[in-house]
Amino acid sequence: RALVELARGARDAGIAAAVPGGRLGDIGAAIVRHVGTSGSIVEAYGGHGIGRAMHMDPHVAHIARPQSGHRLREGMAFTVEPMINAGTATIRTDADGWTVRTADGALSAQFEHTVLIGRHGPEITTLLD
């Protein structure tokens, strides 16, 4: 349960950092601050832009330095979806090319939202009423 809440909180911390005029790196830096030493952030996966295609630029790194990367502008849309492992951050992909497992067999949790940079801050477009 703690890992699930950590992953959900990491996603939410990243979203809260997605403000107009900020930088993409602010998102990853907020995730890193939230997770601290309580888990491992899988660097191999990150968020991605949403637009004319499902997966497009920009890449949203979930481990980043604050004030780095592209400037966030109103109208940008992307996902924030950090994968947090209870053990090491190392993962492996099964032969089916889709299933991902932690290399050490530890538990992992991941939550995702699609975010639109609005005039006054992030707007989550994937919330259910």
Q: What is each of the regions a protein language model found here?
A:
Residues 1-129:
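Active-site neighborhoods and metal-handling regions in enzymes and metal-associated proteins
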